[in-house]
């Protein structure tokens, strides 16, 4: 399977891509509810809100952000009730947003943008300000997350903002580091059926950096609680003390947390000195494929790191699809890229290009494909070297013990060749409530024949077939699966996706698909400009 990697790297080269700059441009918020025009129909049982978040403001005064990830968080709400749909949006009133607004310039640095010294200071004061510790942004623009029944918007710093999902107003700013010894946490936690949340976050100290598994209890003891009771249940030392791996998510089964230490490295020295050197934080991230990728497995119940040393060839993953246990193995499904340099491509100057320049950026980015890895949990000294230790007859993924005791893992492709023509897949979603951590069959994602998603895809990982929804000139967001009441089948429900267009003469809309046959049931059009966003969730009423 891995012999086709070079072929994949060349697959999907495209020319004549349409300009998508309007999708990555500042928009106005829509704080007053707007009624959508429904075409087709929304199921009457579909009652609740699709909440989404992403960047919506890319400059303050004359200062402009450099990277897509830097834009100020814009909260979106599509509310559905009895077949009717309404829309509203508000900018997150973070301290960062308010400070930048008051000064009409970028005061607080973001991932790809270094805030410049106050122009009102004299030369000496501006020079000395380079040696001050930079303020950490609370522009939490990546995802909605849930802890103890409350909703927060999150990024990967130590700050989250609790929001009222009805009004989209910020109600409280919460700092992870006030509760546990971490310097941040991902925006992709996992949840047990009882509501217990798990996450991962880094910590940095005199002895280097650690990756920490975090557990947050499912319920509040007192009414005003936020992250009270959170615990670090396991700390994993990074392979390189001053260059830990960057990660965006992790895997979870019923009993295990799976952390992937990938050769996308964060140079802590560069990050610490970024202000002195006049560089953004993103300058400290580098793809180092001379290192292999390593899988760490942690027992959720005991907090113990399993002794197995699992490795594979270098790859980068941003989003896990699902993971489950079978016959003494962890089966881990991921969206993987063989080239970890894609973060650089998502600078705004690249995304806003047109013509041959835009084609060149797209063709330089590695494609993301779904892959399966199998990690045998109970490897002993007596297990033979050079043989596949995976007992799973349904998967061609292998795990081979080497002379040094390490387990070399080779993946199985989960997709048909048709997916290569769709530009790969990202933003994977499953029927999470019923199939997270369990053997499953379907996932949904965006096809990427452009730098943002340009299709919706349903992929059958058992039969390796796919279904596609596409409308030329329109760009759908991450699909969200909503199960139908009482549905017993895995794909019994609907898919929701916000579909936007750079064409100012066309309306953006919320799309609803039948998850089973992937056919459109309806769309709710709104005459509102929206930028392309990141993630979201559906909350039932």
From Swiss-Prot:
Organism of this sequence: Mustela putorius furo
Record protein name field: Carotenoid-cleaving dioxygenase, mitochondrial
Protein residues bound to Fe cation: 188, 248, 319, 535
E.C. designation(s): 1.13.11.-, 1.13.11.71
GO molecular function: 9,10 (9', 10')-carotenoid-cleaving dioxygenase activity; beta,beta-carotene-9',10'-cleaving oxygenase activity; beta-carotene 15,15'-dioxygenase activity; metal ion binding; monooxygenase activity
Tissue occurrence: Widely expressed. Detected in heart, spleen, lung, intestine, colon, stomach, kidney, bladder, and prostate. Highly expressed in liver and testis (at protein level).
One GO BP: lutein catabolic process
Claim: Glycoprotein is one of the keywords in the record: no
Induction: Up-regulated by lycopene.
